[in-house]
Amino acid sequence: MVVSVTIRRRFVLLLLACTCLLSRRLCFGEDRITFSSPIKDSESETLLCKSGIFRFGFFTPVNSTTRLRYVGIWYEKIPIQTVVWVANKDSPINDTSGVISIYQDGNLAVTDGRNRLVWSTNVSVPVAPNATWVQLMDSGNLMLQDNRNNGEILWESFKHPYDSFMPRMTLGTDGRTGGNLKLTSWTSHDDPSTGNYTAGIAPFTFPELLIWKNNVPTWRSGPWNGQVFIGLPNMDSLLFLDGFNLNSDNQGTISMSYANDSFMYHFNLDPEGIIYQKDWSTSMRTWRIGVKFPYTDCDAYGRCGRFGSCHAGENPPCKCVKGFVPKNNTEWNGGNWSNGCMRKAPLQCERQRNVSNGGGGGKADGFLKLQKMKVPISAERSEASEQVCPKVCLDNCSCTAYAYDRGIGCMLWSGDLVDMQSFLGSGIDLFIRVAHSELKTHSNLAVMIAAPVIGVMLIAAVCVLLACRKYKKRPAPAKDRSAELMFKRMEALTSDNESASNQIKLKELPLFEFQVLATSTDSFSLRNKLGQGGFGPVYKGKLPEGQEIAVKRLSRKSGQGLEELMNEVVVISKLQHRNLVKLLGCCIEGEERMLVYEYMPKKSLDAYLFDPMKQKILDWKTRFNIMEGICRGLLYLHRDSRLKIIHRDLKASNILLDENLNPKISDFGLARIFRANEDEANTRRVVGTYGYMSPEYAMEGFFSEKSDVFSLGVIFLEIISGRRNSSSHKEENNLNLLAYAWKLWNDGEAASLADPAVFDKCFEKEIEKCVHIGLLCVQEVANDRPNVSNVIWMLTTENMSLADPKQPAFIVRRGASEAESSDQSSQKVSINDVSLTAVTGR
């Protein structure tokens, strides 16, 4: 009996092994196709990239009423079918007889049940079929490669995009070939065939992102200024500070790329001709829409016709710009604005050119200023400076408008002005050429208004003059040049990191008067005090218009605070991201130095995590969202912004929460801006917070992205456990949090680290994964730690196999008591007798 059971078991194992050999992809999820290993739809075979993010094979669109089969690439771990590329979009197969294989000519091909060619990469490859293979990369790129030339890429799906724009993909024009890589929409949400809409970079003088319907523009972004497209509202333009960039070379090639390493973003053109940027929410199990365009009716290309400007939210939305009237009043008043507007009065330079009609007289034309505008299409470049730009336009009779942007330079327009829009908070100033009579009209109106005002002012001036004679002459008080000197020092901080053309003009940062901030905080009263930072107190305030603010006031007793405050202004004034706190302005008067931020009503993360009364407010889903949000903000600092920034003081008290408990990273006083080619730096003055500093930074002064990752790992473990890293666990021989988490991990009880207030059996695997990720982040050797993009990927990917963590860093401190946060200590100590490194605890 025992022998028969043993034989039976061996037979079953042999059968399983044979099954795996016959269909290796089903067992191991191979990522490549060779001549001898095709993919058969009838056997449900697919390719899976090594990371498990993307899958390639046959599919039928969700909700499709047909059984048509397409070949494409889609997200594997996301439960909502999200296809990012389709091969045979216009030639589907009617059944499951399709095969994907390396064809006899070495190309990747799709054939149907009758062995008819349905689709092919169609590359001229004079090689034998066994000389090529196809691999699905972790980026979602499908590559046909030549194994004779070190894997030379013969064809790739990223060079043949469909409706989705992926990280590491490029769109744009090729000056050498004349080609233009664009997105193309599906016909409908359940029909992948070629739709009516395309989107891509238009090769204008100043590149713009456009959407076309059957080659007719339906939306445009406005010109690229080096950081954003200037024709987008504020919130939409943030997208292009979040990893997108435009590049051009001397050969006419213009390309748009996405620098974000996280593949949980989806940027696609939908069948209705709308571009969406989304990111995947693991907790909500859905795609969250970040931005979309067009967004309002005013975004429609040429909505108000020639010389018409669109005002979203107003009724009617279309208005003729100053100096112009509707071309057809009846149509205009009836809501048909397509014919646009025409001039009230002809230009003087046009009359001069029309000598046959007796022209040549009259006063010179001038310009009317339109503020916060989306500039018209088809601008031309001029090398003129900001001061000379108006004259260049005025001297050219065909020039109808000009504008100046520091990132672009002088822009000129000739002929009709089309697709203008008025914004509330973004846009640039546009100057439109009008006849002198139009200027005179506005001038006369100004005189009518100003005359009585000037009269009153003259009388008041006489009274003041008479009053002044009663007093002796006194020396005029010295002009307060605090702000001017401060800004000069701040701009000096940026000069080593950026070229002059890319520097932010710090003088454009709003300046608040001291009295305004004093009034808004009720003279900095204790009841408005939100907390005490390492460099001074923070107060809640309310501006006259009702906006709530947070005011950080530099303590005069802080010897190092001025440098950190200046550094914070330099760093944060350049950053825009939904997971970073927003700087509204500053105050520099006399000895007063203050920063003004958006107010975060829920205060800081530590106020909830470590308060027994508030811990339950942060349920597990909220804590997970906070961890993900912190990662996205940190990824922006490290990779996606135009600067590379290391925070150096990431901790729970520097994570602020908005009204929806979304996290925002704050306190950039210790942040360092890196050059593009820098990966690490060192300092003789180590500043930070005990318990959050990485060992290489605390011991040797070396810091890099991985230093912030260490701090991130500590925060992860604090969020999971609801305990401070600096606190000890008496039940475990006074182990700190890292040591305690490491012990639980080795004992196979990682989920036991979770805060009992939020632990739920249904989240146990996710909690274990987060502990695992936290321990990977706090490994002692910096190179062993993941980067932030990998942390995001691990967080947002289900059923992913993670590397085992190595022992965390345990730092033994001598000569100083534990400093729990920057709120309590600012003393200097020495660590492990490293005398050259001054460590400033916060």
Swiss-Prot record:
Side of membrane Cytoplasmic, spans: 466-842
Glycosylation site positions: N63, N94, N122, N130, N196, N260, N328, N336, N354, N396
Extracellular side: 30-444
Positions that bind ATP: L530, G531, Q532, G533, G534, F535, G536, P537, V538, K552
Bulb-type lectin domain residues: 32-157
Modified residues (Phosphothreonine): T683, T837
Name of the protein described by the UniProt record: G-type lectin S-receptor-like serine/threonine-protein kinase At1g11330
Protein source organism: Arabidopsis thaliana
